[in-house]
Amino acid sequence: MLDGRRSNSILPTSLSPNSLTTPPFFFHGGHGTTVPDNLYLLLPLTSAILYAIGSLGLRAAAQEGVSPWRSIFMANVISAAAFQIYLRGWPTPEVPAEWLPVLGLGLLFFCGNILTVLSLTYGDVSIATPVLAAKVVIVVAMLAVLGDGNVTGTTWVAGGLTVAGVGLLQIQGKNHPRHHHVLLTILLSLAASTCFAGFDIGVQSLSARHGFHRVAPYAILTAAVLSLALLPLCNMRYREIPTKAKRFIWIGAGLVTLQATLLIYSLGTFQDAAGINIVYGSRGLWGIFMVWAIGKHFGNRELQTNRGVFKFRIAGALCIVTAIGLVFM
């Protein structure tokens, strides 16, 4: 259900949304801080905003000639370092109770990154973006198949509104080039969405059984190790990257890391993959807003001023805001 009450038997009592404890760097008040109702959904909302800004940095770096493979490598390595804060028992931290599933989650995360870049590089961005947003519906469908009691009719409606909203936000003007590689774009984007959906549900399920600290840090570390294979694909060495591009890539990778830390933490701790993904789906809306608000600082001139495009973006924004409202109700 979406009102904060949980009936799922795999959820430990200590993780009940009405008595959740969170680290003081997320919510002030120290140990034992309670999180009322659906306040935890502010975490994926923050992640969506940070992702929108971070993506501007990564796109600006790409415009300066930085390979997207370099961006993936840096983001995954920085994320692996950041996730070490969740480990317990230093200097000999607790290890996963089940190594194979955790390594599998790392592989899913890595493959999702690769497929996303391929869909955006070799496909049509205006098609890839809304299809990638279908991750919301895939997560809801997977949870329904697995018998998660939190999936309701409202969840399905909110998920559908999110995908529709992202699709409307991506509609281009009349002068936009015709779509190309449509089937390839859809297949790559769906594959990426499925990988990330599997990762989200896996983190939620394994964290409920073994603890977030024994799952996510090792899964992200696995993705970082796999990312070493991307270095030969980079078009230049790090020291050859222009100073301006380095600034953009560090801003982008840093913010993408921070948003991933918040998002994955919320998935593993609050056990609401459907609601969290619906709220996180607002990143498309925030992306449009950030291009308008600060895009010029990143050399971004994407935003169309065509009235026909503007009305579709207003409709898309309303869909996403409605979806978020349904989740918070």
Predicted regions and their residues:
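Loop-to-transmembrane-helix transition segments
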Residues: 39-47, 74, 84-115, 183-194, ...
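Transmembrane alpha-helices of multi-pass small-molecule transport proteins
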Residues: 46-58, 63-111, 161-164, 215-238, ...
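Small-residue-mediated transmembrane helix hinge/kink sites in multi-pass secondary transporters
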Residues: 59, 117, 143-144, 204, ...
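Structural motif at transmembrane-helix junctions in multi-pass transporters
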Residues: 64-70, 115-131, 208-214, 262-284
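Alpha-helical transmembrane segments and their helix-entry boundary regions
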Residues: 71-72, 102, 125-129, 137, ...
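Membrane-interface helix-cap regions at the ends of transmembrane helices
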Residues: 79-97, 141-145, 167-177, 204-205, ...
